[in-house]
Each structure stands twice: as structure tokens, then as C-alpha cells.
């Protein structure tokens, strides 16, 4: 049989290794020969040795695939033309792009948390001129955003960022998202009208529980003990920092169990909604052959189905806000006039339109950032980023903000709760060190 180039390569490397072994008593355990700018996806060549023998082997290691592991956000690793692997050492390993990926998620989470703080603060400021028209502001954020999202989607399509394949993805998941969001809104509004603010804050922490549960069921994701404990501490920290000393327990006794269960059901629907969006992104990667679905495709189609469902529920929702359905058109007209601060009949709208417009812009930026964080990491990470914004916003309300008048005081357990929250975040992000043997890079599980 004719000698192939592979045979010559093995023979040459064996001879070279023999000379290296004679020079050093403790040879390196592994050497990676990486072909940069590989052609036709040829796998890199890895040279391995065993601790117990002097035999060296050459084997081809296929490029690492994207896979769902136990870490949120670690499963989707960007492919790059140049891959740098660990060389030598006792089983040390590195995944190309992992550090960059982690930094991207950290920056996105911090941005989402900051926008979440701004969203909460500006919402309270926007309600100062619109204190008589909160239902108008809620419907503006539902109906008005559809036009904005589809306008952005149109321009992105014309620019070639959004493709026809992206627009042709199945619409049933978006319908499910719209139904979940509208039902969550209706259930939440009905329960919130009978619960106190601190009670709602306590019950809202079940949102994270539902997300973890749905991620395990529908995404097959596994969480480490430190991640579960970290999420628990984050939720407990928010409860301590915001609701401590506010009579939340007494409020639960006064309102009964029915409204509390309805609020928990509302957060169940919201948890299912965010996990469903994560499913949409993961499924679209398969349908688009690795391409990433544009954010505004999800925002636009999800919003239009939500608007349809909200329109069907308007008689019920307006009644919850104490507005007879036959008076809804005049209420919307007056709310719009107050939003723009026009008309002599409308009074008490000082601060409009600046404050409401600032809230609308901040709210859109927050929603987009939240969806992007779901896309690049997971629904649970996005929930943690949103949860962190709660105590920070509470602290901001103690500052001398314009239009708010006398600043509020910090809750009694704010500092202790914030410390618990930070410890929970650090515990969730902590990755336990694992002892590995001779492997250069771990093989991804079969998909």
C-alpha cells in the first residue's frame, strides 16, 4: 500500500517526539496543533500523551458545537475562524469565545437592569401628569408600540437585516405569546386591584420559580445547586428589602387567598411567556440554519397578537379600572389630550408631554433589551436582571426627584435585603471548579 501524507505526518511527529522525550524527563501531556483559517471545516489536529506511557497519538477533534448545558447562556457559543485551545497542563481546558460570550451577557444584563430602574422610576413620574389616566398609559404601551415595532421591522427588512426566511417562521408561537401576555395582564390587573403594593412585590418573586420550572420542563435545562440557591436568595432579598415592615403579611390575611392565587397565576403566565420566547429563538436557529432571528420579528408579531387579545378583553379590563365601557372612547380622548398637554378642558397635566414621552421611550428600550437578553442567554437570566432593578428603583425614590415632592424613606430591611440579593447573584454566577484529566476540550453532548 502506498504511503499516504497522513502516514508520513505520523512518522515524522513520532520521530520528533522521540527526541523531545529524550531531552525532558516530564514531557508535556498534550500539544494542540491548530490550523488557523481552516478550509472546508477541517478539524484541528490534537497531539496527546498518556501519563502512564510514552505513546503519543494524533487525533482529529471536530469543532465544538453549540449545545445546551447546565449554565444559562453558556450553551450558545459563537463560532470563530480562529480557535485557541489550552496547551499542556493537568487537564486545563478552554472554549473559544466563552469569555467574550460571558462578558457580552454580563454587559447586557447590567444594561437591562439599568433600563429596568429607569423604566420603574419614569413610570411613576409619568403617572404624575396622567394620574387620572393610568389605563390610557397602559393601552398606549400596548397598541402604540405595534406601529413602532412594525415600522422598525419594515426598515430593517429594507436594509437586508431581516430576511424573508425570518418573516416566514411559524406564527403559532407568536399567537401563544400574545395570548399568554394578555391573560397575564388581565389576571394581574384583577389581583392588583385587591392587593397591596408590598403583597404584590412578595408574590412577584414566584415569577422566577415558574421560569426555572418551565425551563426544566420545556427546554430540558438542568440547574446546579448553587444556581437554585442563588435564585432563592435573590427573590428573598427583594422581599426583605422592599416589603419588610410594610404589613404585607397583614395584607394577605385581609384580602384572602383567592386574589393571592390569581396574582401567582398571573406570574405563572408571564413565566411561560418568557420561556416561550426563548423557545422561539432556539427553534428559529434550526429553521434558519444557524442564523439568528431578529428581535423585532418577535416583538412585532408578539405585539400584534397581544393587541388582538387585549381588544377582545377591553370590556373586562376597562371595568377593572372603573371605566364603563360606553365611556371608554371619551376617556381615551381625554387621556390623549392630557398626554400631549393640550386643550383648555384638561387640567393637572403639568409635566406632560415630557415625562410620558420619556417613559414611553425608556419602556421600549427596556423591552428590547430584555428580549435581547433572553435571546443571548436565557429567560432566567433576564428575570434576575429585572429583579435586581426593584431595590435599586426603591432607593432612587428616596432621592429628591423632580415632581415627586417629598422623597420616600427606605424600608426597614433595605440594606439587609440588598446584601442577600447581591450574595444570591454572586452565588448564581459562581461556577464550581471541576477536576479534569487529559482532555483538551470537553466534547459536547450529542444533539
UniProtKB/Swiss-Prot annotation:
Organelle targeting sequence: 1-48
UniProt note: phenotype after gene disruption: No visible phenotype, but resistance to L-buthionine-SR-sulfoximine (BSO), an inhibitor of GSH1. Clt1, clt3 and clt3 triple mutants are more sensitive to Cd(2+), have a decreased level of cytosolic GSH, an altered systemic acquired resistance response and are more sensitive to Phytophthora infection. Clt1, clt3 and clt3 triple mutants have decreased lateral root densities.
InterPro entries documented for this protein: CRT-like
Topology relative to the membrane: Multi-pass membrane protein
Transmembrane segments: 103-123, 135-155, 172-192, 200-220, 228-248, 256-276, 304-324, 351-371, 387-407, 413-433
Principal subcellular localization: plastid
UniProt-annotated location(s): Plastid, Chloroplast membrane
Gene Ontology cellular component annotations, sorted alphabetically: chloroplast membrane
Keywords recorded for this protein, A-Z: Chloroplast, Membrane, Plastid, Transit peptide, Transmembrane, Transmembrane helix, Transport
Role this protein plays: Involved in thiol transport from the plastid to the cytosol. Transports probably both glutathione (GSH) and its precursor, gamma-glutamylcysteine (gamma-EC). Exhibits some functional redundancy with CLT3 in maintaining the root GSH pool.
Protein family according to the UniProt entry: Belongs to the CRT-like transporter family.
Protein's name in the database: Protein CLT1, chloroplastic
The organism of origin for this protein: Arabidopsis thaliana
